[in-house]
């Protein structure tokens, strides 16, 4: 089914299809929590293959692993400045066509001509330095089940005792967390904060 699907979509990958399949399977767990999916929607073990496949593909579209997708510019920035998450493959080695997932971002997703971009922590270091030494009027919003929150500033020492810098963690929030995602009192607090800044 996977091969047929990718052929029909005319996807071109920088790795053999079995490897793309492996990466798509690993992406499922990350995507599930990132987007705050409902565990009750996970197909039961006796669900027919087509329904399981459709559910999975809807969550982990393999075009994500092409190097010409809509996120190509972000992929380059991730490889150069931001870093990117990996997949823990060791417990699954006997089932995989890949030996390891290390370096998959540059190998699979960075556009041709940019594969050799070197990572530099300069932007990260500059950001942490700026936020440590300054108190900018900024609101950071995270969802508490979003794995991307692991790379955020929530709970870091430099966020304490700031008057203007505010960091909010949305209960049950995913990557889709927005101001409107928060319970009413917190939502209003954020709105009042930003409204006050706009009036200055």
Region locations from a protein language model:
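Alpha/beta-hydrolase fold active-site neighborhood
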Residues: 1-119
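Generic recognition of flexible, low-complexity loop/linker segments
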Residues: 64-67, 124-130, 155
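Extracellular/periplasmic catalytic domains that process cell-envelope and extracellular macromolecules
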Residues: 70-72, 131-134, 158-162
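Conserved alpha/beta-hydrolase "acid-adjacent" motif
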Residues: 89-90, 147-152
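Short beta-strand/loop motif that positions the catalytic acidic residue
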Residues: 134, 140-142
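Low-complexity, glycine/alanine/valine/leucine- and proline-rich hydrophobic stretches
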Residues: 143-145, 153-175
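Short coil/turn segments at secondary-structure boundaries
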Residues: 152-154, 181-182
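Catalytic active-site module of serine/aspartate enzymes centered on a nucleophile-bearing elbow/loop
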Residues: 169-200
